[in-house]
């Protein structure tokens, strides 16, 4: 190199001697600087602005105020309405206490590893679901778009359930509760009980007729239900206001929305234990039926529940974790949140069956009283001989044990005539075996139980306020799974995007507040999420393990966590989880194919539910929900594979860091190029290859040398490579 070259002069003046290769070999200095810089997302051009080290600069990408706030957000997202009204039903249906064993096994094999995977990629790359999968491979960017579509489909109908809860909450401030008794109908001559209510029950009538004013089929829209329209609007306004500033606004609400449901559940459990029959309900719940546990259907339903309970594939988990510090222990978070979710489900199951045990006891006492009166009538009429009734039994004040004794005697003596007597066995187990889930549990069975509580309005207010908070916690994560990826990718303002999303969702959601809206909720719940989310998570697993590389990913985790994660995760991610997810997908497709597509319609004349098949247009909608949700995956792959559009979303130009200002050199993630850093302090930018540090130090000195202008940039590197180039060109 000529002595008078500008590069030599720089070396003499500024003690700069590193070549491009030397610069790329620096490691220690970059590692030190890693801890002093913070990630922001910025789509603007780089600014030649000096920022003093240690100066207070507000990050453009928000961060959690505390670890507790983050954990509560993840818990609020994963613990939702399904924990209260689906897990108890599955537990009862699939062997009682024995169901907990397959659930725990699948939680360890599928749940925690995949939850840990989503947390770690979000925290490492610090983007939403679209950016994360673009980063790993631009051809797989459709995975993130598919997550957003599924999130939006789910948000459309999930917020309707919050609207229903708001309606019941608003109606709970009266004594007696409006669903306590059947309404009376008056005409010119006399007063009588509403026939539809008399044939069903007061709570069933109130749900279908007063709340939903439901039509007889999905084809009869019946117009909008104005009461539910107002409640849906209120629900979306609440979500919009809570999410308009992202985690900066929702983070403050999370403390209440995540913790309040636990307060209510514990209060309900204590209150239920003081009521007659609660122990019967819990005993019935946890009596194991081991023979059922070996059925394949039990394991399929347990795997599906684990999958959806943790919110896998929605993108909310990735979005929340993207606001974490890079060195956060996401493995601890995955295990903690997973087991909190499990114990919440068990707690909710205890509460549900303690309350249903009390309800069954009340109904059983009424049954015994009514049937005892019927037996006394038969005794007076001579249909039954007084001699067969034991002398120590008084049918006027009969106990359950004595009634069952009399019932068995009459059944044996009057064997041929017994069916004509229309006597009921009045066994509490039969009442508890009437499995209910979903809206049937929350808005019919549980509301009926609360009418028998002392101070029933108070408990009703608490219960439906709990449902609102459970729903909002899940909605925050769902909306975050939509907004964060789009903001990161397209650089739109979060406030504007949030308002547009909520406004559009309310307008589309009007189909759910028609008189036939409940049938559309069932349709979306059955078809919009199950298959698409399974496909999304399978592709996530493949992307990390086989496209990016499981070995490099394990190195990244070691770099982030400060310790090597157990090899257990290596084998789960690479072998076990993909096989189990594929098996679950096949089983779900087979089950969906064997189950006739339809819904339970409320028939007013019969005052009962009746299964109806979807009309042709309904089948088209069902198929469209699945296709539209998963369509972004092949579309993005084809577009990127054949370069059909000029797209730079595979670059890292959108990721910048303050404190040392400013990283801005696009890098193709599919190539081996290394990004270039501009600034006085090397930044904490994720490298295109997770397992490699961008800088490597040659001499081991504590600081990384810079050019005279304080930059690492194109000009400085080119000066070292091409010394004869004019300085103005550098």
From Swiss-Prot:
UniProt topology in membrane: Multi-pass membrane protein
Reactions accelerated catalytically: L-leucine(in) + Na(+)(in) = L-leucine(out) + Na(+)(out); L-isoleucine(in) + Na(+)(in) = L-isoleucine(out) + Na(+)(out); L-methionine(in) + Na(+)(in) = L-methionine(out) + Na(+)(out); L-proline(in) + Na(+)(in) = L-proline(out) + Na(+)(out)
GO-annotated biological processes: amino acid transport; L-leucine transport; neurotransmitter transport; neutral amino acid transport; proline transport; sodium ion transmembrane transport
Subcellular location: Membrane
Pfam families according to UniProt: SNF
Topological domain spans for side Cytoplasmic: 1-69, 643-730
Glycosylation sites: 187, 213, 383, 394
Acidic residues composition bias: residue spans: 43-59
Membrane spanning stretches: 70-90, 98-117, 142-162, 226-244, 253-270, 306-323, 335-356, 453-472, 496-514, 530-550, 571-592, 620-642
pH dependence: Optimum pH is 7.5-8.5. Strongly inhibited at acidic PH.
Extracellular side: 163-225, 357-452
Keywords: Amino-acid transport, Glycoprotein, Ion transport, Membrane, Neurotransmitter transport, Phosphoprotein, Sodium, Sodium transport, Symport, Transmembrane, Transmembrane helix, Transport
MF terms in GO: amino acid transmembrane transporter activity; branched-chain amino acid:sodium symporter activity; neurotransmitter transmembrane transporter activity; neutral L-amino acid:sodium symporter activity; proline:sodium symporter activity
Annotated stretches, region: Disordered: 41-60
Record's GO cellular component terms: membrane; plasma membrane
Tissue spec: Almost exclusively expressed in the brain.
Main location class: membrane
Highest taxon in the source lineage: Eukaryota
Cited function: Functions as a sodium-dependent neutral amino acid transporter. Exhibits preference for the branched-chain amino acids, particularly leucine, valine and isoleucine and methionine. Can also transport low-affinity substrates such as alanine, phenylalanine, glutamine and pipecolic acid. Mediates the saturable, pH-sensitive and electrogenic cotransport of proline and sodium ions with a stoichiometry of 1:1. May have a role as transporter for neurotransmitter precursors into neurons. In contrast to other members of the neurotransmitter transporter family, does not appear to be chloride-dependent.
Database matches in NCBIfam families: Na_transp
Family: Belongs to the sodium:neurotransmitter symporter (SNF) (TC 2.A.22) family. SLC6A15 subfamily.
Protein name from the UniProt record: Sodium-dependent neutral amino acid transporter B(0)AT2
Gene, per the UniProt record: SLC6A15
